[in-house]
Amino acid sequence: MRTISYSEARQNLSATMMKAVEDHAPILITRQNGEACVLMSLEEYNSLEETAYLLRSPANARRLMDSIDSLKSGKGTEKDIIEWVMLPTY
């Protein structure tokens, strides 16, 4: 994770924000007399929040992990996005 000082972040706030957005990577901002903070794009933040929400339920987390294991062991089926969107909902 890229790390910059509070002073550098303040002097280059717009460029620092653009870097976080373009690189899809958080930036650690340190302070001499306080806790550090992390700057990240709204897209990255929303992604973390969604992941946390999906993993909050132990049953859902287990289903997701089982699906990942299934794909890693070659049991997955590749589909085009159109096929996936057109799947019936029950």
From Swiss-Prot:
Q: Which UniProt keywords apply?
A: DNA-binding, Repressor, Toxin-antitoxin system, Transcription, Transcription regulation
Coiled coil feature spans: none
Transmembrane stretches, by residue range? none
Q: Which family does it belong to?
A: Belongs to the phD/YefM antitoxin family.
The protein's matches in PANTHER family, at most eight in alphabetical order, are given as: ANTITOXIN YAFN-RELATED, ANTITOXIN YEFM
Which organism does this record belong to? Shigella flexneri
Pfam families annotated for this entry? PhdYeFM_antitox (PF02604)
Query: What is the designated name of this protein?
Result: Antitoxin YefM
Which InterPro entries does the annotation name?
Answer: Antitoxin_Phd/YefM (IPR006442), phD/YefM_antitoxin (IPR051405), YefM-like_sf (IPR036165)
The record's subunit annotation is: Forms a complex with YoeB which inhibits its toxin activity.
Annotated function: Antitoxin component of a type II toxin-antitoxin (TA) system. Antitoxin that counteracts the effect of the YoeB mRNA interferase. YefM binds to the promoter region of the yefM-yeoB operon to repress transcription, YeoB acts as a corepressor.
Gene Ontology MF terms:
DNA binding
Q: Which gene encodes it?
A: yefM
